[in-house]
Amino acid sequence: MDNSFDIYEIKARQVLDSRGNPTIEAEVLTAGRGYGHAIVPSGASTGTFEAVELRDLGKKYGGKGVLNAVGNVNEIIAPELIGEDSRNQRLIDNIMINLDGTENKANLGANAILAVSMAVARAAADTSSLPLYKYLGGCNSYIMPVPMMNVLNGGKHAGNALDFQEFMIMPIGADSFSDAVRMCAETYQSLKKVISEKYGKDAVNIGDEGGFAPPVKTIDEAFSVLLEGVKRAGYENEIVFTLDSAASEFYDEKTNSYVVLGESLSTDKLIEIYKDMVSKYPIVSIEDPLFEGDFEGFKEITKELKGIQIIGDDIFVTNTNRLKKGIEMNAANALLLKVNQIGTISESIDAANLASRNGYGVIVSHRSGETEDSIISDLTVALNSGQIKTGAPARGERTAKYNQLIRIEEELQISKYAGKNFKIPF
C-alpha cells in the first residue's frame, strides 16, 4: 500500500499581506516528502455573506492579528488530518468543515481552513510530480484566461472621488496570454503618461491592486482618461473595458438608494446610468452593479443589458446556495470566484462547476489584500474558466499571478487563449 500521499506534518504561521496586515500561511508535508504551502488573501470590500475571516481583535496589529487562526491549525486541524491521504481533497475539506461546525466557518476561521485546504492540494500535486493546474484539472486543462487588469481605482481601493471601485481593461484581441500581458503592460505605461500630463506627476499614485488613483471626479472623466491611454498604446481594436462597481459600498439601506457622486439614485436610475455607459464606451462586463441583497435588481439589469456580462461577487460570495438562487432567477450571468469567500478548494470548484453547467461565466479572482501566492493562476487553468481578475501589471503580489500564467502557457505548449470567447471559452 502506497502511503506516500499521507499527510505527515501540518503547521501554520502569521505572515503579512500586501497591505501590511497579518494573514495566515500553512505548510503541509506528505510521507513521500511532497510539500505544499499557501498564504490566504483578504478583501477590503467584503460581502456580508462571506465565510468568516478570524481575527484576534487584540492590541497587536490593530486587532487584525491571526494568531488564533494559526493556533486553530496547529492545535485542532493538524491532529485530525495527520495520516489522511492528501489526494482526498473533498474528505479533508469536509473534516475541517465538520470540525468548525458552523455554516460560515466562524469557529476555526475560513482563513485557517483555506490555508490548509490550499496547502494540501499543493502537497498532493507535488507528491504526484504534477503541476498544480494539471493535478486539479487533469489533461483537459488547456485554456489560458483573458486577464481583467485593474488600471484605474476608486471606491475603497483608492482615495479619490470615484464611487465605482475598479476600471479594468480586457485584451480580448490578443493571440496568447503572454501577448495579452504585453498589451496590458504597454497600456498601463501609456495610461501613466496620460495621467501625469493631465493631473501632474503627483497623480500617478496607485491603489491597493496596482491601478492608478488620479483625482478624477466623474465616471465619464475616468473613461475618457482610460480611452486615451488605450489609444496611445495602439490597442483600440484589441482592448475592451470592464467595471467593478462594488455597489454595496455606496448603497444606503435606510433609503434603499445609491449615493453616487453625492446624488441619491434609485435602482432604476442606476440601471439607466449603466445603459448609458454601455452605449458610450466599449464595456463588455460589469461586476456587482447593484446591492448584494438585490436579486430582483440583478435579474432586471441582466435582462436590460443584453450581451453584457453581469458578474455576481458580493451577491454570490462563491456560495453554491446563493448561486443556485441567482441561476433560478436569471440574476447575473457570471460568477466571481474567490476562494477565501467560501474557504475550501472543494467548495470553490463546486461553485465554478455549477456556474459553468448553467451557462454562467467564471472569473477566478484575487483580493485587494493579496500575497505572493499564485494558486489562483493554477486554479483558473484547471477550471478552464477563461477569465482571471488579479489587478494591474504592477506590484509583486499581482505580477506573481501573471508570471505564473506565463510559465503555465509555456509549459502547456498547446493551449488556447480564451480571447473574445472569454465567457464560454470551451
From Swiss-Prot:
Family: Belongs to the enolase family.
Cofactor(s), by name: Mg(2+)
Biological process annotations from GO: glycolytic process
MF terms (GO), sorted A to Z: magnesium ion binding; phosphopyruvate hydratase activity
Residues that hold (2R)-2-phosphoglycerate according to the record: Q165, K338, R367, S368, K389
Pathway: Carbohydrate degradation; glycolysis; pyruvate from D-glyceraldehyde 3-phosphate: step 4/5
Catalytic reactions of this protein: (2R)-2-phosphoglycerate = phosphoenolpyruvate + H2O
Keywords assigned by UniProt, alphabetized: Cytoplasm, Glycolysis, Lyase, Magnesium, Metal-binding, Secreted
Residue positions binding Mg(2+): D244, E287, D313
Family matches, as InterPro entries: Enolase (IPR000941), Enolase-like_C_sf (IPR036849), Enolase-like_N (IPR029017), Enolase_C (IPR020810), Enolase_CS (IPR020809), Enolase_N (IPR020811)
Transmembrane annotation, as ranges: none
Compartment annotation: Cytoplasm; Secreted; Cell surface
PROSITE patterns referenced in this protein's UniProt entry, alphabetically: ENOLASE (PS00164)
A single Gene Ontology CC term: extracellular region
HAMAP family for this protein: Enolase (MF_00318)
Protein name listed in UniProt: Enolase
The UniProt record lists the keyword tRNA processing: no
Cofactor binding remark: Binds a second Mg(2+) ion via substrate during catalysis.
EC code(s) of this entry: 4.2.1.11
